[in-house]
């Protein structure tokens, strides 16, 4: 009996020992950040154990651990980007709630340099916008000054930001800022009047340019497209510069939900223009103010506002001109002026945009923009000129002496004398309002984009411009007949019109054993109420990046492009028997049309410690329904 009691007693002692060893404790709680928001996937680990024991928090920051009871337990709470917290627990028993707050771990990392090559998709080429800040440029550091480095792009006036692309005119190039097309003043006739470019280089993040065969998302111009994207500053930044030719101030600030930029530019070219052949008092001033503001209205929606006001004030009082030309038998033309020119060009632009994601695959946007221009061109200039052999310095008195030159007075070397009078009282006022919608659907290797827009235009134009020349004294004495003018243009017109535009385009990327293929096909459709013309514009491209040479890219692009008239093309002139030209607006004018075919390739390589891109392109352009025009300085007159 005693043996049985001993055995039972021994079994009870073993059971109590096992029970005591199996007793556990439960530790639970939340891991949160400085804003008391749960941190997902934070690590909770027991340090003072022989084998690793731990868990990770869920999306709400909750964790739970089942541990053996112990006298001392050390828990470690950690997460990338946060400081690690250790919690020491004395006499761990049963259930314990521990909530931990992790602070942001701010560390200054050593500077690193990341290099990579991104293939240009389609015919759009990327430009480093920072380059314009160090390039000498008479227009004040414009983005357009970089375009002349591209094949097929030329510039005929260094005082202007306008350019020609593959034989096209200045009016055949479209410019977009944040996906919205911007317009230029319409009356400007010379680079001296033009002033600053619309694009402020300090506010630019991305620049893309295409010299032909561009996609369906870009509008209805025949030659090229320049696409500008403004940046969102992540923190405070500012810049200031000043010189004898002008000044600019830029201030930007931003965070994760809000950003703002302000740019103010001033330019004067009086010192540069003083070196022109026509001596006189040049006093041009150019002013430009821009602002770009973005803000988050929710987790998936963003609003933005872009505003611009530009004022060009051009004043010129000519004095004299002396030019020699010819070879062995050199001639000299000397002109003494009276009168002055006063021009004023005021433009304003504003755009309100909303963009958001309605799902993981679909993103949509809406834009409301307006453009206004008020332009005045006034001059009355008379001149007395003498054409002679050789220099006029010894045969004619200087205009600075105050002596009046008699154009009929005999001179030793004079071949001819005469008078002229140039007069203009031109004004133009225009407004454009545009409402647009665009969207993107992306799934896998397929991207579909679409857009639709409506535009209303209101323009009022008054022109009274003429020139009179008398090189033979035929107007004095008066013979009673009407005096003919050398040139005259008169008109007073107004127009209102509406445009509807829509586009759709699909891009598919296909990876094969031979490399990556990118197929893009789309189309654009527009209608204009002025001539009731409907214009379909199909466009397509294919690209191939060979698998055996990833730094090569070949492409073929084509499309049918229409350029509907805006306003200047509509002027229909009629000249009467007295040389007076009057103009009216042509309701039957059709859009100009062009077919583009571009075949090219890019080769990316590194040399001398920096990246290079070698591009070769061949293009074909077929143009019909072309409107004839004349070019005088930067003015295009149809």
Where are these regions (language model features)?
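Short, acidic, small-residue-rich periplasmic hinge/interaction motif at the N-terminus
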Residues: 32-34, 42-49, 78-83, 93-136, ...
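A short, solvent-exposed loop/turn motif at the edges and junctions
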Residues: 47-52, 72-87, 267-269
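Short, acidic Ser/Thr/Gly-rich low-complexity loop/linker segments typical of extracellular
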Residues: 49-62
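Periplasmic N-terminal accessory/gating domains of Gram-negative outer-membrane beta-barrel systems
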Residues: 83, 88-90, 96, 118-173, ...
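Short strand-turn segments of transmembrane beta-barrel domains in outer membranes
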Residues: 193-197, 205-214, 224-253, 259-264, ...
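Transmembrane beta-barrel wall of Gram-negative outer-membrane proteins
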Residues: 239, 243-266, 279-317, 341-364, ...
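Face-selective signature of the C-terminal outer-membrane beta-barrel domain
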Residues: 296-311, 340-531
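Membrane-embedded beta-barrel scaffold of Gram-negative outer-membrane proteins
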Residues: 365-369, 588-638
């Amino acid at each position: 009996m005693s043996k049985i009691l001993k055995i039972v007693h021994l079994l009870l002692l073993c059971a109590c020992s096992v029970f005591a060893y199996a007793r556990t404790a439960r530790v639970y709680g939340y891991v949160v950040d400085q804003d008391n928001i749960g941190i997902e996937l934070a690590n909770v680990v027991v340090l003072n154990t022989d084998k690793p024991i731990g868990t990770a928090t869920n999306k709400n920051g909750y964790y739970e651990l089942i541990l053996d009871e112990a006298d001392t337990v050390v828990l470690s709470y950690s997460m990338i980007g946060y400081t690690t917290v250790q919690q020491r627990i004395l006499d761990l028993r049963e259930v314990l709630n521990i909530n931990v707050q992790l602070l942001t771990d701010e560390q200054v990392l050593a500077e690193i340099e990341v290099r990579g090559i991104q293939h240009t998709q389609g015919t759009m080429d990327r430009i480093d916008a920072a380059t314009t800040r160090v390039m000498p440029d008479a227009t004040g550091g414009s983005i357009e000054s970089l375009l002349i480095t591209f094949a097929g792009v030329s510039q005929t006036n260094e005082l202007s930001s306008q350019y020609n692309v593959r034989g096209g005119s200045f009016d055949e190039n479209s410019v977009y800022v944040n996906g919205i097309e911007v317009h230029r003043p319409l009356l400007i006739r010379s680079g001296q009047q033009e002033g600053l470019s619309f694009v402020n280089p300090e506010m630019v993040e991305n620049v893309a340019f295409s010299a032909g065969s561009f996609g369906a998302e870009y509008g209805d111009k025949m030659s090229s497209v320049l696409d500008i994207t403004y940046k969102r500053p992540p923190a405070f930044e500012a810049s200031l510069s000043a010189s004898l030719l002008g000044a600019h101030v830029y201030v930007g600030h931003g965070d994760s939900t809000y950003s703002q930029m302000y740019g103010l530019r001033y330019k004067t070219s009086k010192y540069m223009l003083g070196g022109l052949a026509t001596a006189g008092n040049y006093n041009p001033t150019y002013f430009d103010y821009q602002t770009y503001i973005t803000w988050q209205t929710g987790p998936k929606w963003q609003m933005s506002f872009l505003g611009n006001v530009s004022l060009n004030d051009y004043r010129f009082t000519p004095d004299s001109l002396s030019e020699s030309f010819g070879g062995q038998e050199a001639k000299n033309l000397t002109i003494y002026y009276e009168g002055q020119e006063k021009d004023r060009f005021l433009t304003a632009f504003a755009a309100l945009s909303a963009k958001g994601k309605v799902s993981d695959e679909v993103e949509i946007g809406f834009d409301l923009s307006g453009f206004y221009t008020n332009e005045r061109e006034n001059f009355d200039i008379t001149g007395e000129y003498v054409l002679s052999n050789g220099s006029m310095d010894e045969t004619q008195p200087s205009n600075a002496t105050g002596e009046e030159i008699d154009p009929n007075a005999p001179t030793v070397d004079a071949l001819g004398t005469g008078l002229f009078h140039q007069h203009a009282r031109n004004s133009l006022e225009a407004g454009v309002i545009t409402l647009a919608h665009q969207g993107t659907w992306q799934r896998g290797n397929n991207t579909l984009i679409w857009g639709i827009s409506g535009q209303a235009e209101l323009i009022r134009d008054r022109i009274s411009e003429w020139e009179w020349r008398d090189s033979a004294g035929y107007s004095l004495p008066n013979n009673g007949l009407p005096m003919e003018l050398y040139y005259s243009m008169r008109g007073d017109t107004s127009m209102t019109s509406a445009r509807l535009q829509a586009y759709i385009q699909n891009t598919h990327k296909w990876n094969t054993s031979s490399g990556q293929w990118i197929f893009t096909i789309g189309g654009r459709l527009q209608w204009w109420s002025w001539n009731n013309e409907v214009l379909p514009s199909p466009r397509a491209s294919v690209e191939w990046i060979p698998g055996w040479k990833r730094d090569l890219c070949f492409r073929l692009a084509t499309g049918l492009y229409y350029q509907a008239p805006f306003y200047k093309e509509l002027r229909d002139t009629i000249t009467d028997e007295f040389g007076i030209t009057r103009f009216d607006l042509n309701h039957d004018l059709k859009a100009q049309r062009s077919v583009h075919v571009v075949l090219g390739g890019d080769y990316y390589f590194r040399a001398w410690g920096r990246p290079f891109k070698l591009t070769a392109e061949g293009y074909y352009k077929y143009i019909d329904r072309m409107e004839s025009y004349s070019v005088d300085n930067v003015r295009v007159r149809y």
